[in-house]
From Swiss-Prot:
Matching InterPro entries: MFS, MFS_dom, MFS_trans_sf, MFS_TsgA, MFS_TsgA-like
Protein name in the entry: Protein TsgA homolog
Domain of life: Bacteria
Gene that specifies this protein: tsgA
Coiled-coil regions, chain positions: none
GO CC aspect terms: plasma membrane
Length: 394
């Protein structure tokens, strides 16, 4: 593979994470406007976004096998067509069923693209470089989380219809589409058998289970928190939508900066120990945010939370890939799928909590999930295989 093609494929990976980040994170900003558009309570409206998360989960799960059957390039081109259909559905269709179908299509496109992006990074890069590349790739999720809430808040403040926010997000896929047409992709499945190394079957071990559950709890906790921050800030502290959007953007700015910094720092630490420390600090930072009565402190706490939690998810995935001597794409996809289950469950879990006990209770639940991540990471120390496989970095 020549270097220019590798760079194009790497940028496809970056944009795939940005696309998923934009679709998932912008929900908290536009949800109130969409609920008003369809004349529904916001707690009921949140349930329809489960279609987005379900699409992501199903496509990531199935694509572990479909990547070996349908060429990656064809999948991405088809994804572009689906993206156009979904955006057109939001603009032309004015009923809840078409909205739900469009959200599901967004999820399918996002999941396919993200799973391909993750595979490309793990396929093209080895060893320490893989972990730092995954972390940098994941930072584009955060970058989208920084840019699109601000853009969405600006559009909504100017009374521009909410569906134009999704049209703006669609521009990311235009970039993916153009790069796809110019790139050559790795060949998977039977056609690649002759060129591939013999597959070494290894038992994953109980450590993978701990990592998978931690990934689920982390994503569910993170999204369960960040999706309700705008509603919490506007209703509890009487902030306007721009101020609430700025809180969300502050989180993702800090998250992105943290990813860039930790991509250099992590190589000097044992991954299991550092992720345990980061999970503890993130739990504390979220507790301070949820507990404070002073709105002036919210920005400080959410900045701290974004920074210390930035490396947790990617480190969990990297630790998973190090549980076997030979990295297993299916193992990585399994942990990624479990994280996506957390995405899908976001409104399934938090929607009823908000309806029955209020937004603050949903944020407290998210804090409890972060505590669970800390406990799982601590327990992982007794089961992890990355040290015995010689994967410890110094």
């Amino acid at each position: 593979m020549n270097n220019s093609n590798r760079i194009r494929l790497t940028w496809i990976s970056y944009l795939s994470y940005a696309l998923t980040g934009a679709l998932v994170i912008v929900t908290g900003i536009v949800m109130g406007n969409i609920a008003e558009y369809f004349n529904l309570p916001i707690a009921s409206m949140s349930n329809t976004f489960t279609f987005l998360n379900a699409g992501i989960l199903i496509s990531i799960f199935l694509n572990a096998w479909l990547m070996e059957i349908i060429p990656l390039k064809r999948q991405l081109v088809f994804g572009f067509i689906l993206m156009l259909i979904a955006i057109a559905g939001l603009m032309v269709g004015h009923n809840l069923m078409i909205f739900s179908i469009s959200m599901f299509i967004f999820g399918v496109v996002s999941g396919i693209t993200m799973s391909i992006g993750t595979f490309l990074v793990t396929h093209m890069y080895e060893g320490r470089q893989r972990g730092s590349r995954l972390l940098f790739t994941d930072s584009f999720f955060s970058m989208a989380g920084m840019i699109f809430p601000i853009a969405a808040a600006m559009l909504l403040a100017r009374h521009i219809e909410w569906y134009w926010v999704y049209a703006c997000i669609g521009l990311l896929y235009v970039g993916i589409f153009v790069l796809t047409l110019c790139s050559e992709f790795p060949v998977l499945g039977h056609k690649a058998t002759d060129q591939s190394k013999p597959v070494v079957k290894e038992k994953w071990g109980v450590g993978v289970l701990f990592l998978a559950i931690a990934a689920l709890c982390y994503i569910l906790g993170q999204l369960g928190f960040i999706q309700w921050v705008p509603e919490y800030a506007t209703k509890t502290f009487n902030m306007n939508i721009s101020q609430a959007g700025q809180l969300v953007s502050n989180f993702w700015i800090s998250y992105m900066i943290g990813m860039w910094i930790f991509s250099f720092i992590l190589r000097f630490f044992d991954l299991q120990r550092i992720v345990t420390v980061l999970a503890a600090m993130a739990t504390l930072a979220m507790y301070l945010f949820v507990s404070t009565d002073n709105p002036a402190y919210l920005s400080y706490y959410i900045l701290a939370l974004g920074f210390v939690s930035s490396a947790i998810y990617t480190t969990l995935i990297t630790l998973g890939s190090l549980q076997t001597k030979v990295s297993s794409p299916k193992l990585v996809n399994f942990i990624l799928t479990c994280g996506t289950v957390g995405t899908m469950l976001t409104f399934v879990v938090t929607g009823p909590i908000v309806a029955n006990n209020g937004v603050h209770a949903a944020l407290e639940t998210a804090n409890g999930l972060y505590l669970a991540v800390f406990i799982l990471c601590l327990a992982l120390g007794f089961f992890t295989k990355h040290r015995s496989h010689g994967h410890v970095t110094h």
